[in-house]
């Protein structure tokens, strides 16, 4: 038990970047919390607003874009989400080089893109105004907002960034409900979208005024590609990639899943709002705990729990059970979203490099969010049901949780020693996977083997190379067997 406490202490204290003694992290105070709240306002207007695209898609398919398929219209939202994260590759380094003022121009463009969307009538217009301009301007705002909060906090970083990211959950509750009510009222499309634009104008104005960089701008190379030579950083981003391939599946498909099991359209619509409301608390509570036990301990824990809950989704077919799933999934997946930026920020060697590290991490996330939904859509079209979608999403998140555990061991054990411990952990997984039992038992209890492999590495390390390969591939093999049998 003492070794667990020691590892948590090492992770949370040793590895976050050290500020110079003359510039200690405030870890609180009016200015620091104002920045966290201001950044939360930015996420409310960007990430939170993007969560409302499902409402737009339902409206477009019966109104302006009725001649286009749902798959065609979905590209508007996919491109918007891709640029929301991908533009961080530019926004993060700009924050490190020029400070908080870099957020002003994209903040104006966010409002401009919403107002232009209200005037659109053709597909290419929606694609340009909402998909490309909206996504890019939001992404250029998002990365500096996250980076500004990270500059003010070290010991309380996960909690502070959880507060910031909770702004997106609040937006994910308010914007879909507001749009749903206004679009189908006497207001019509144009004024419904403009009212949303005015809401964003008010919140974004407060947010921009609240955000300040703590440290002076630092002249440096735009990207720090040498960061990808750090095993710790690469392991973290690999884990984040797999987590983001699967994490958004229920946000895209849960209403459709509910309707396919007899849920009314009205109740199914509110499932996303329920998820986002639960996610609000999921981005706060795990962040507070992460500051006590370490962000990687918390990230791997909530990732594995989220994956297990997603496997349980297979058996949830009644209205009550689907709503329970929505609440549980929203909370624990919110923990993943809330802790991820703190874990990435901890990889930076200096506080003035945090923006660049977060920006490069967001670029990796953008690829995952771009390919995840189409894979799920292809599985749904191929098999005509949700089983393969559920298994795929749960499996990649379980794998991401395992990798997050490996990144944690690398972070506080040193690169060589950490990799040896990770080998033992995966060998432990292989040992349990190969010892019989049903396939679902392998998937459900594989996470237990990670801990067993860490605690009993020498026992499980016989024929380690063979077992390592088996351990990494075992879970995916069982998933593929499901697909083969279903086909």
Swiss-Prot record:
Transmembrane segments: 35-55, 75-95, 99-119, 126-146, 159-179, 191-211, 234-254, 262-282, 293-313, 322-342, 354-374, 385-405
Keywords: Cell membrane, Glycoprotein, Membrane, Transmembrane, Transmembrane helix, Transport
CDD domains: MFS_MCT_SLC16 (cd17352)
Short name of one Pfam family: MFS_1
PANTHER family the record matches: ASPYRIDONES EFFLUX PROTEIN APDF-RELATED, MONOCARBOXYLATE TRANSPORTER
Family: Belongs to the major facilitator superfamily. Monocarboxylate porter (TC 2.A.1.13) family.
Main function: Efflux pump that may be involved in the secretion of aspyridones.
The protein's name in its UniProt record: Aspyridones efflux protein apdF
UniProt source species: Emericella nidulans (strain FGSC A4 / ATCC 38163 / CBS 112.46 / NRRL 194 / M139)
